[in-house]
Swiss-Prot record:
Membrane topology classification: Peripheral membrane protein
Lineage of the organism: Bacteria, Pseudomonadati, Pseudomonadota, Gammaproteobacteria, Pasteurellales
Domain of life: Bacteria
Protein name: Molybdate import ATP-binding protein MolC
Catalytic activity line of the entry: molybdate(out) + ATP + H2O = molybdate(in) + ADP + phosphate + H(+)
Location(s) in or outside the cell: Cell inner membrane
Oligomer status and interactors: The complex is composed of two ATP-binding proteins (MolC), two transmembrane proteins (MolB) and a solute-binding protein (MolA).
UniProt KW keywords: ATP-binding, Cell inner membrane, Cell membrane, Ion transport, Membrane, Molybdenum, Nucleotide-binding, Translocase, Transport
GO CC annotations on file: ATP-binding cassette (ABC) transporter complex
Keyword Cell membrane: yes
Job description of the protein: Part of the ABC transporter complex MolBCA involved in molybdate import. Responsible for energy coupling to the transport system. Functions as a low-affinity molybdate transporter.
PANTHER family noted in UniProt: METAL TRANSPORT SYSTEM ATP-BINDING PROTEIN TM_0124-RELATED, MOLYBDATE IMPORT ATP-BINDING PROTEIN MOLC
Cell membrane in keyword set: yes
Amino acid sequence: MNKALSVENLGFYYQAENFLFQQLNFDLNKGDILAVLGQNGCGKSTLLDLLLGIHRPIQGKIEVYQSIGFVPQFFSSPFAYSVLDIVLMGRSTHINTFAKPKSHDYQVAMQALDYLNLTHLAKREFTSLSGGQRQLILIARAIASECKLILLDEPTSALDLANQDIVLSLLIDLAQSQNMTVVFTTHQPNQVVAIANKTLLLNKQNFKFGETRNILTSENLTALFHLPMFEQQAQYKESFFTHFVPLYKTLLK
């Protein structure tokens, strides 16, 4: 089976009958990268919670065909965990309750760090790291869980441009080299253009899902963000690419 995830007629609300979204449908195959794009408060994080089973659908159903790993937008702890401790948390589903990690678990955790070229940070205290390093460590934790479907909640929101590029490149590599299915939330259209082959636009109870090249248009983005969005073609060396530019009201003054 090539299918990774199926969402059928999904409906959910926090307050009775005030649906956050309704009759939401989409399917993903193994190796797909789905960007969930929308304004703050549109339900992006709630959708991830539903996929994780934290919330139960009010309507419809969700079928997950792969093991799930999750990378939260923020992670904090009152304890002085080392980087290796954090990555080992990804092994929790493979370790019996109250049992200590085995040598194989340490090996898998170090392999996850090695995959990201971060083994030199293994003994560092997690809270001493930069925002970009912390985000990569949380991705390493998900990789150590040996998941095949990784969900990321705005993984670049606190990162500078250089670290955003590192994370986005990593997600492409996970999909292409590991055949991992990737779902990430964002409110940045140009990140969607850069890496996602599938896009889900969430706009209150309205949604659009499909191939990114068909969904990500100036018309759809303008309706989504209530701000004029212009599509532009650019060139870097011999490569041509599309990006979107917002027309901020302050520019018209």
